[in-house]
Amino acid sequence: MKKAFVLAAAVLLGMGSMMAQNTFKGIVKYKIESTGTVSMNIPDEVANAEIKVDGDNLYTKSPIFLGGMGAECVLVNGLRTTSCMNLSQLLSYLRTNGSEFTYEGTGKIIVKNEADPKDFDSLDIKDTEPGHFYYEYVDGETKEIAGQTAYKMVRHSYDEEGVDHPMTMWYSKEIGPKINVLFSGIKGMPLQCTMDAGEGRALTYTAVEIVKGKVKEADFLLPDGYETLSDDALKELFEQLQEEIELLQGE
């Protein structure tokens, strides 16, 4: 009887965990605008962005959401991130200028990373140390964006002199992963955010349309033609790239 009770409890806990996950399936479409005191020219390929969502899975090819040089698309599966990077032009340029690399491939590579959920446990704990940041989730402040209830969050970031550079973000709790590694671990999907680009320039991305159900499994497949390197080979390639770029900059 005790075993049956334990099994039933485990099933209920599992169901609770499943219910806690977001089940939204669709596309979040954004408009990117220059909103600073100094105007910026935003190319068409940047001005319109989108993220495809299927529960905890995200996929985007939009430049505004891609980190790292040469990134062409990012796939998120919960805490796992897979980036397709095209370094072919950079490698060709450096090789033309006399640089040599151990790596002999085309430059189209896959970079994988899996985050530890413990890394995000302290993100909403106040931390004012220089060089640190934390998230302040503001209770009671909401607004509607693209038909969704958006909740307020402020990212407090402290420079080396201890000065806070707050950034306000409005996000949905009903869309995307509970820990969104595409956006540094926030608890949902950003719907609006203004980013300081320096010298009076700023970019604001805002969700303008949320399309439900218009995604399929094939939308979350990586493109062909990319190779996966070992961790050591990937580390060596990036170290050599950094070294060669620094040498060119110093000339």
Language-model segment annotations:
Residues 1-23, 28:
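Bacterial Sec-dependent N-terminal signal peptides
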Residues 22-251:
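Extended soluble regions of mature proteins
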